[in-house]
């Protein structure tokens, strides 16, 4: 049996690595953790690795990419035997790198124990998954476990928030820090400067000891500039030179890639954007990003997930009312909880915000099911309006009381737009 104090899952991870011959040793490995931004950062990392002529395998929330073939993903980080088999297949099929999202659940449940990353990157931390970890301190401790000598050779840490700053201080690894908010008054090896918002994204400068790089990202929002900077600094930390990055990025026109369900622009008039934002922090950032480039009204369609951290429901309602002109509260994935109860939790925060000066002008409606809410928003929007459909992103299955229904927000937007064209 396992010795006391060792975890069976940890043992399984190590045995899996031995069975498959520690396949990750043949690859350059990048692990990305943090509350929001993991998926986008890993997609951007993979994109630039491809520009550099490498062949990255990808393990994450949206897809699994092995040997250049992508398939839909079931969970952020697979269980260790599956993971080792996936990595072994990558090596066999000629992949040169492994880029992986590492969730705090995966760290706590020892799924990635047998992998050691060349570079472990940290986006930021905010209250999410507290149903699993209990409080922010234990959530931080779970994330921090990735940044130990057994798990990684080098840390790249975004120091925009206090958690990143603390991780950089406490971490036992060689650390490269990056500050991406202009307002962050903290020492960092690399910083982002001169962000200019464009219709489709942002231009920005990454500047550090070794020089600077002016480039662009084709995803809206300053938080995506943060993700881009983290991806680029992770590559620099892995040994890619600034000159090489400059060469491939100027040839490609910057980080010119879309990420499924991450600030994904489905149409332009009205502009419909589908995003995975499913906590207050991400919702606030997404709304702020779209507000700055919307000449008409800003609409948001969203709900909260059932059987998850219930404290964030009212807060999401409040953020929506303060950030948008038109709010439609609908269903997300209710799971086995009564959808009306979840909507009421969100609505309570929305109504409270409407009672304040800042939220007084916002229109709030409750419309279910979700497809009807999306249709209502699209029918109502003017040509210069923006509609953010938040919470589900790339997901194509909605779980209601144990039944999986097909539902793709992007598809519902297209259907609603076609109906709108027909009635104009």
Where are the model-predicted features located?
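Short acidic, glycine/proline-rich loop/turn micro-motifs
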Residues: 68-72, 217, 399-402
């Amino acid at each position: 049996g396992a010795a006391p104090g060792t975890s069976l899952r940890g043992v399984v991870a190590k045995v899996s690595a031995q069975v498959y011959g520690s396949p990750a040793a043949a690859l350059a490995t990048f692990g990305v953790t943090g509350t929001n931004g993991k998926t986008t950062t890993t997609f951007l990392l993979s994109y630039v690795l491809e520009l550099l002529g490498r062949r990255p395998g990808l393990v994450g929330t949206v897809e699994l990419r092995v040997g250049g073939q992508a398939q839909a993903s079931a969970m952020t980080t697979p269980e260790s035997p599956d993971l080792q088999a996936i990595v072994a297949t990558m090596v066999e099929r000629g992949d040169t790198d492994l880029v992986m999202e590492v969730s705090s659940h995966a760290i706590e449940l020892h799924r990635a124990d047998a992998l050691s990353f060349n570079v472990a990157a940290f986006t930021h931390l905010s209250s999410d998954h507290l149903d699993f970890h209990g409080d922010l301190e234990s959530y931080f401790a779970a994330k921090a476990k990735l940044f130990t000598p057994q798990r990684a050779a080098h840390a790249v840490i975004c120091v925009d928030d206090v958690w990143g700053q603390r991780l950089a201080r406490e971490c036992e690894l060689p650390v490269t820090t990056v500050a991406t908010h202009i307002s962050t008054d903290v020492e960092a090896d690399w910083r982002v400067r001169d962000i200019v918002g464009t219709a489709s994204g942002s231009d920005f400068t990454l500047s550090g000891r070794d020089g600077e790089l002016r480039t662009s990202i084709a995803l809206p929002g300053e938080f995506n500039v943060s993700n881009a900077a983290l991806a680029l600094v992770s590559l620099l930390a892995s040994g890619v030179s600034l000159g090489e990055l400059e060469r491939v990025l100027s040839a490609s026109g910057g980080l010119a890639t879309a990420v499924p369900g991450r600030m994904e622009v489905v149409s332009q008039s009205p502009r419909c954007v589908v995003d995975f934002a499913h906590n207050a922090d991400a919702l606030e950032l997404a709304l702020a990003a779209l507000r700055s480039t919307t000449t008409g009204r800003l609409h948001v369609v969203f709900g909260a997930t059932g059987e998850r951290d219930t404290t964030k429901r009212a807060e999401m309602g409040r953020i929506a009312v303060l950030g948008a002109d038109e709010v439609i509260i609908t269903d997300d994935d209710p799971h086995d909880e009564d959808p009306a109860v979840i909507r009421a939790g969100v609505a309570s925060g929305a109504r409270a915000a409407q009672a304040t000066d800042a939220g007084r002008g916002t229109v709030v409606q409750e419309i279910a099911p979700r497809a009807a809410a999306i249709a209502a928003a699209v029918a109502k929007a003017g040509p210069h309006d923006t509609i953010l459909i938040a919470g589900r992103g790339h997901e194509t299955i909605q779980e209601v009381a144990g039944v999986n229904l097909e539902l793709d927000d992007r598809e519902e937007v297209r259907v609603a737009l076609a109906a709108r064209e027909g009635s104009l």
